[in-house]
Amino acid sequence: MQLCCSSPMVPGATLTAKARNLQAWGYPAIAIFQPYAEWNQSVRDELFALEGRTGVRPVEFVFTDEIYGNAMSADDDLREQCRAMYRAAAQVCADLGAATEIEYQYGPQNPMPLFDPYQQLDSGQRASFIDFYREMLALVEGTKARVLLEPLNRYESRYLNLVADNASIVDEVAHPNAGLLPDTFHMSLEESDLAAALRTAGDRIVHVHLGDSNRLLPGRGLLDWASIFDALKEIGYTGFVNLECSTSGDPAVTLPEAARFLHALITA
């Protein structure tokens, strides 16, 4: 396993500055969360030169915008705007050899599903989402890029909260560029046993997001990190583990500390 960190967590006015900080702090990879409105040829050129300039590899790429999370919206215009943005991210990943992720929906849920967890897609919803997933996968077919499903907690998505629910869709599409992106923070709200869920997901797991139970850096909440990393080792996971959480203070201090904490788990 190798360490990775999400770009919004890292100080720096440019991708290059962020990557150089990460290189100094013990992270060989970066996940790029790129504001869609700020995307242009100059930023693209910087992204594609990043590894050569800094030694830090961009392994995940997502566009961020207020339209994010609406790929299955009932609003035709909003749905198409979101899908166009997702398709653009997938095309970047096809050229870069990186992973991107999608989900059925993303955003605050109203009404909040406090006492009605694990809601399931009906047959029409499932079929429509699978059709969209296959459309996204076709954009990266034949490349090293991946389009992954990330299980989100019930307060951010009404459906597909469990790793197993997402795994069933990955199995149905049966595409070599598909896979899972479990996030330990989301899992802490939905899974009764994180390690067991990871073991069951097995080789469907392509990328991992890390955040503790309070979405702080690993080791600053309630999660049993030794059992999580033991499970990843048992399934033979050798990919990237990416921090996607609060920096819990000054990142120049806390991110190097987190790298040491995670490295000890990886090598234990």
Question: Where do the language-model regions lie?
Answer:
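Active-site acidic/histidine proton-transfer and metal-coordination neighborhood
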Residues: 53, 72-179
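Histidine-acidic metal/acid-base catalytic patches
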Residues: 1-26, 45, 52, 134, ...
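Active-site-proximal loop/turn and secondary-structure-junction residues that shape catalytic pockets
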Residues: 9-11, 34-36, 64-67, 106-108, ...
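Catalytic domains of carbohydrate-active enzymes, especially glycoside hydrolases
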Residues: 17-35, 96-100
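Conserved beta-strand positions in the central sheet of alpha/beta enzyme cores
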Residues: 31, 60, 101-102, 148, ...
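Glycine-rich, proline-tolerant flexible connector loops at the mouths of alpha/beta enzymes
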Residues: 31-52, 108-109
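Residue-level detector of anion-binding/catalytic polar loops
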Residues: 28-29, 57, 99, 146, ...
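Non-cysteine beta-strand/loop elements that form the S-adenosyl-L-methionine
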Residues: 57-64, 102-104, 203-212
